[in-house]
């Protein structure tokens, strides 16, 4: 794998050699390395060869976010595979937690991301993943249909495959669709998994990574913030300073949070199952 990475980097940086190769802690999904090649520092994700499509999708999402010129993301240098492993090579940006100032700036940047481009439908040109969960993105013109079927219904079906039952799937999907039936927002490009673990302060300001992008309701990104108390509230303030949210945003917030809560429940079980069921019960009773 390292020979393949060196070859791809040499095509862009000229001949060099690997000067540093340190495995990083916390690689819960993929192995992660800090690599120095020809004086440049890189962050390398690697896994089994069969997982190359996931790395390709991540690279495509980072490129899409970069193309908006609104947010900072790690530059992708290489994505590929050898006989045994697949890999994704990006800029290495030593992460620090966001402070109040950088959180405010990030909030402004996210607001501008949501204003970028003019997309008439909801979805994405390819499917991707939320953490390790496959995420479908088939294009759909009605937001209520997209979110009810491809977000909530999808999570409920995946949970059922693991023997986790939250109720009648068809009835829940219908309820969610009705809750959103009168809400048809302008599609915005979303990061899709905007929590504190995917935001950091780098050498040149805040940056985001590990996206789960799709074109959706901008409120979905903002609905994530209250689920993570460690996320500085100034992100929300910065966002509001550029693109104020509608007054009825809080009515839809628990609907959008349910997607993340169901995903956690299926992945981690335990108390997450209780939290997701309680959230769903409150929505169905409203």
Curated annotation (Swiss-Prot):
Name the InterPro entries on file: Fructo-/Ketosamine-3-kinase, Kinase-like_dom_sf
Q: Which UniProt keywords apply?
A: ATP-binding, Kinase, Nucleotide-binding, Transferase
Q: What class of enzyme is it?
A: transferase
UniProt-annotated binding residues for ATP: 91-93
Q: Name one GO molecular function term.
A: ATP binding
Q: What Enzyme Commission number(s) does the record list for this chain?
A: 2.7.1.-
Q: Name the catalytic site residues.
A: 193
Summarizing the function annotation, the protein's role is: Ketoamine kinase that phosphorylates ketoamines on the third carbon of the sugar moiety to generate ketoamine 3-phosphate.
Family under the similarity heading: Belongs to the fructosamine kinase family.
Q: Can you name this protein?
A: Probable ketoamine kinase YniA
């Amino acid at each position: 794998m390292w020979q393949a990475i060196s070859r791809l980097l040499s095509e862009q940086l000229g001949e060099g050699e690997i000067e540093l190769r340190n495995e990083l802690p916390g690689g819960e999904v993929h192995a992660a390395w800090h690599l120095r090649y020809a004086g440049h520092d890189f962050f390398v994700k690697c896994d089994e060869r069969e997982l190359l499509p996931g790395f390709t999708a991540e690279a495509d999402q980072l490129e899409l976010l970069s193309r908006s010129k609104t947010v900072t993301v790690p530059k992708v240098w290489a994505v590929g595979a050898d006989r045994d492993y697949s890999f994704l090579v990006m800029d290495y940006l030593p992460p620090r937690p966001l402070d109040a100032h950088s959180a405010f700036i990030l909030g402004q940047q996210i607001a501008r991301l949501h204003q970028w481009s003019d997309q008439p439908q909801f979805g994405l040109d390819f499917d991707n993943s939320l953490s390790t969960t496959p995420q479908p993105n088939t294009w759909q013109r009605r937001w209520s249909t997209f979110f009810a079927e491809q977000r909530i219904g999808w999570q409920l079906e995946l949970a059922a495959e693991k023997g986790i039952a939250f109720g009648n799937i068809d009835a829940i999907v219908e309820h969610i669709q009705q809750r959103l039936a009168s809400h048809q927002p302008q599609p915005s490009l979303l990061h899709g998994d905007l929590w504190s673990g995917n935001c950091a302060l780098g050498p040149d300001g805040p940056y985001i990574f590990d996206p789960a992008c799709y074109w959706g309701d901008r409120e979905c990104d903002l609905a994530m913030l209250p689920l993570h108390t460690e996320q500085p509230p100034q992100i929300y303030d910065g966002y509001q300073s550029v693109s104020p949210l509608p007054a009825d945003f809080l009515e839809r917030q628990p609907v959008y949070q349910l997607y993340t809560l169901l995903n956690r429940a299926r992945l981690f079980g335990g108390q997450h199952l209780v939290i997701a069921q309680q959230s769903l019960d409150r929505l169905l009773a409203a």
